[in-house]
Amino acid sequence: MQAFEQKSSYERAELITCGQGNMFGPGNAQLPVPNMLMLDRISHISQTGGEFGKGEIIAELDITPDLWFFDCHFPGDPVMPGCLGLDAMWQLVGFFLAWKGNAGRGRALGAGEVKFTGQILPTASKVTYHINLKRVIERKLVMGIADGRVAVDGKEIYFAKDLRVGLFTNTDSF
């Protein structure tokens, strides 16, 4: 395994490497691998940017009609499950915490508010996730709190406030 190189963007192959546990080291945060990896690239990640100046992530998922979830959700009425977009936002907050150099396995801890106002259909081209970190705790507890937005082909279709993800060096109590 190569030493982790903190960059400002990542391509799909690098995200899959992260999912295989080969980016941040053994026992540390991983992204899911396909099919649960809900992003194709991180186009921008920053420790200081974003709406609150605490960090920002912009990531994308390319939509094609043959994505696995369109066949089963729902037959004859295909739509990407909203929970997959929500999970993508949690995935990105966990990635951010590890990208900053924090140890531990990522676990979603909740969200304050989630609102859906649109849908992702197989005719869409691209989903964009925009995460704005509000607070990053890096003590005995490592946790990120963020607001996130999901857009399809440039139109915002849902948001989540106060997404919470923690990194844990011991997950036995879960």
From Swiss-Prot:
Q: Reply yes or no: does the keyword Isomerase apply.
A: yes
Q: Which controlled-vocabulary keywords does the entry list?
A: Cytoplasm, Fatty acid biosynthesis, Fatty acid metabolism, Isomerase, Lipid biosynthesis, Lipid metabolism, Lyase
Q: Which domain of life is it from?
A: Bacteria
A Gene Ontology biological process noted in the UniProt record is: unsaturated fatty acid biosynthetic process
* E.C. no: 4.2.1.59, 5.3.3.14
The name of this protein is: 3-hydroxydecanoyl-[acyl-carrier-protein] dehydratase
- What are the top taxonomic ranks of the organism? Bacteria, Pseudomonadati, Pseudomonadota, Gammaproteobacteria, Cellvibrionales
Localization terms from the record: Cytoplasm
- Which species is this UniProt entry from? Saccharophagus degradans (strain 2-40 / ATCC 43961 / DSM 17024)
Enzyme active site: 73
SUPFAM superfamilies, per this entry?
A: Thioesterase/thiol ester dehydrase-isomerase (SSF54637)
Question: Which Gene3D superfamilies does UniProt cross-reference here?
Answer: Hotdog Thioesterase
Catalysed reaction equations from the record? a (3R)-hydroxyacyl-[ACP] = a (2E)-enoyl-[ACP] + H2O; (3R)-hydroxydecanoyl-[ACP] = (2E)-decenoyl-[ACP] + H2O; (2E)-decenoyl-[ACP] = (3Z)-decenoyl-[ACP]
Location, primary (coarse class) = cytoplasm
Q: Which GO terms describe its molecular function?
A: (3R)-hydroxyacyl-[acyl-carrier-protein] dehydratase activity; trans-2-decenoyl-acyl-carrier-protein isomerase activity
Q: In which pathway does it act?
A: Lipid metabolism; fatty acid biosynthesis
Self-association or partners: how does it assemble?
Homodimer.
Similarity annotation: Belongs to the thioester dehydratase family. FabA subfamily.
Which Pfam families does this entry report, sorted A to Z?
Answer: FabA
Give a Gene Ontology cellular component term annotated to this protein.
cytoplasm
What functional role does this protein have?
Necessary for the introduction of cis unsaturation into fatty acids. Catalyzes the dehydration of (3R)-3-hydroxydecanoyl-ACP to E-(2)-decenoyl-ACP and then its isomerization to Z-(3)-decenoyl-ACP. Can catalyze the dehydratase reaction for beta-hydroxyacyl-ACPs with saturated chain lengths up to 16:0, being most active on intermediate chain length.
